[in-house]
C-alpha cells in the first residue's frame, strides 16, 4: 500500500500545521500501550500538563531541569515510531523534507521563547485514557494502604483482648488504621494524661 503524503504548511499568521493526519483517539491510545512507547510517555505528559497543551522545548527544560534537546529528541523519535508503526502516511515539511513533529503536534509557531507546539487533541484524550487506566491498574495490582497489608488488623484484635481502653489506644498508635500523622500525637497525649 502506498503511503499517503501529508504536507505541513505555514499559514499567514505563521502557524505550521499539516491538519488532520487521520489518527483517532483509540489509535493513539493503542500506540501508547506498546512497550516501545513507554520511553516517550513522560515527555508527552509534560506537554499535556501545559496550558492548552502547548510548550517550547526551552520552557520544558527550565521547568523540569532537563536539557531542551531531550524534549526535541523524544518527540521526534516518538513521531518517527508512530509513522513507522502505522505505516500509512509521511509528512513533508515546508522545506520539502520529511518532518515529524507535525505528527504528534497539531500546530506550531515561533515565539520569543522558541518554537511552541500544541499536542493533538486526539493524543491528549488518549493520554488521559492511558493515565486513568494506568492508575486503575496500579491500584488493582498494588498493595492496599500504601504497601501495608491488612494482617496487622487481625493481630490487633488478638493483642487487645481483655485489655483496657488506654492500652488499646497505645497499641493503635502507629498501626496505619487512621491518619497517623494527625492522630498519633493526639492519642499519645490522651494516653499520657489518662
Model regions and ranges:
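Phospho-regulated, low-complexity intrinsically disordered regions of nuclear gene-regulatory
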Residues: 96-165
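Short, Lys/Arg-enriched N-terminal segment that forms or immediately precedes the first helix
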Residues: 16-33
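Short alpha-helical "packing" element that flanks the helix-turn-helix/winged-helix DNA-binding module
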Residues: 39-47
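Short amphipathic alpha-helical interaction segments
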Residues: 68-78
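Short helix-capping/hinge SLiMs at alpha-helix to coil transitions
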Residues: 48-52
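Short, low-complexity, charged amphipathic interaction modules
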Residues: 1-8, 150-194
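The alpha-helix within a helix-turn-helix
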Residues: 61
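C-terminal flanking helix
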Residues: 79-86
